[in-house]
Swiss-Prot record:
Protein role: One of the primary rRNA binding proteins. Required for association of the 30S and 50S subunits to form the 70S ribosome, for tRNA binding and peptide bond formation. It has been suggested to have peptidyltransferase activity; this is somewhat controversial. Makes several contacts with the 16S rRNA in the 70S ribosome.
Sequence segments annotated as region (Disordered): 225-276
InterPro entries: NA-bd_OB-fold, Rib_uL2_dom2, Ribosomal_uL2, Ribosomal_uL2_bac/org-type, Ribosomal_uL2_C, Ribosomal_uL2_CS, Ribosomal_uL2_dom3, Ribosomal_uL2_RNA-bd_dom
Domain of life the protein comes from: Bacteria
Molecular-function annotations in GO: rRNA binding; structural constituent of ribosome; transferase activity
Gene name in the database record: rplB
Protein name stated in the entry: Large ribosomal subunit protein uL2
PROSITE patterns: RIBOSOMAL_L2
Protein family: Belongs to the universal ribosomal protein uL2 family.
Subunit: Part of the 50S ribosomal subunit. Forms a bridge to the 30S subunit in the 70S ribosome.
Presence of keyword Transport: no
Disulfide bond sites: none
Protein source organism: Cupriavidus taiwanensis (strain DSM 17343 / BCRC 17206 / CCUG 44338 / CIP 107171 / LMG 19424 / R1) (Ralstonia taiwanensis (strain LMG 19424))
Length: 276
C-alpha cells in the first residue's frame, strides 16, 4: 500500500493523492454476498431531508460484512483475497471456512491472502482473530468491538481504527477509544485483535469537486451567503458577517457545542473524550 501523487495533467489531478494497494482483488466481488442498495439521498421514509449534502454518486452494491463472527467458533478459515468496498473506508477480506462457506470481514492491518484465521475463545492472540474480550490479554490493541454481546461490532470499524483493552473488573472491561474516551463493555462482547487496515486512507487528497460528487456528497453552502429565510446568518447588503455566534440552519450553536443527550449509557463512560 502506497500514496501516489498524480502528474499535473489537469487542475483536478494537480493535487490529487491516491492510496494504491496492489494486493486488492481486481475482479468482481463475490456475488452471493452482494445486495441491492437503493439511493436514499439523505431522505427518510417521508421524503424529508434528514442528512444534508447527500445525493447522486455512483451506483454500487452493498457487501454483506459479518460483524458478529460468533457462529463459526473453532472452524479454521483462510483469507482468500482482499477487496475494495465502496461503502466504507476500510478494505474487506473474503474468507473461506473449512466447511466451505465464504464471508466478508473487515480487513485488519497486515492481513494478506492465504493467512489463517480462527474465531472463538480458543483462538490465539493474533491479528485478525476474533474472540470474547474475557479471553484477550489486557493491553492488547483491538478493533471491531461489540457494545452489546451478540449485537455485532460497532466500535473501531473505520480505516486505521483501533482501541486498547485497559482493564477487566468483574463482568465489565474498560476500553480506551481513539478519541480518548474510556468506555465499559461486557466481557462477553467480542473484538478482533489488531488495527483496521488501510490506515493511509486519511492521507488521500480527493483533488477535484467531481470526485466528491462520485461519492454521493453534494456541495455545502455557507449560511452567510443565503437569504434570511434560509439561514440565521443570511441576509445583509453585500458581504456581511454573520452577526452572531455560529449556528446551524435551525439555530443550534455549532462549532464545538455539545449535543449529546443519552443518559441511558452515561454509566458506561468511565472517562469522557473531552477530558483527555
Amino acid at each position: 500500500m502506497a500514496l501516489v501523487k498524480t502528474k499535473p495533467t489537469s487542475p483536478g489531478r494537480r493535487s490529487m493523492v491516491k492510496v494504491v494497494n496492489k494486493d486488492l482483488h481486481k475482479g468482481t466481488p463475490y456475488a452471493p454476498l452482494l445486495e441491492k442498495q437503493f439511493q436514499k439521498s439523505g431522505r427518510n421514509n417521508n421524503g424529508h431531508i434528514t442528512t444534508r449534502h447527500k445525493g447522486g454518486g455512483h451506483k454500487h452494491h452493498y457487501r454483506v460484512v459479518d460483524f458478529k463472527r460468533n457462529d463459526k467458533d473453532g472452524i479454521p478459515a483462510k483469507v482468500e483475497r482482499l477487496e475494495y468496498d465502496p461503502n466504507r473506508s476500510a478494505n474487506i477480506a473474503l474468507v473461506v471456512f473449512a466447511d466451505g462457506e465464504r464471508r466478508y470481514i473487515i480487513a485488519t492491518k497486515g492481513m494478506v491472502a492465504g493467512q489463517q484465521l480462527l474465531n472463538g475463545s480458543e483462538a490465539p492472540i493474533k491479528a485478525g482473530n476474533n474472540l470474547p474480550i474475557r479471553n484477550i490479554p489486557v493491553g492488547t490493541t483491538i478493533n471491531n468491538v461489540e457494545m452489546l454481546p451478540g449485537k455485532g461490532a460497532q466500535i473501531a470499524r473505520a480505516a486505521g481504527g483501533s482501541a486498547v483493552l485497559l482493564a477487566r473488573e468483574g463482568l465489565y472491561a474498560q476500553v480506551r477509544l481513539r478519541s480518548g474516551e474510556v468506555r465499559r463493555v461486557h466481557i462477553e462482547c467480542r473484538a478482533t485483535v489488531g488495527e483496521v487496515g488501510n490506515e493511509e486512507h486519511s492521507l488521500r487528497v480527493i483533488g477535484k469537486a467531481g470526485a466528491t460528487r462520485w461519492r454521493g456528497i453534494r456541495p455545502t453552502v455557507r449560511g452567510v451567503v443565503m437569504n434570511p429565510v434560509d439561514h440565521p446568518h443570511g441576509g445583509g447588503e453585500g458581504k456581511t458577517a454573520a452577526g452572531r455566534d455560529p449556528v446551524s440552519p435551525w439555530g443550534t450553536p455549532t462549532k464545538g457545542y455539545r449535543t449529546r443527550s443519552n443518559k441511558r449509557t452515561d454509566s458506561m463512560i468511565v472517562q469522557k473524550r473531552h477530558k483527555r
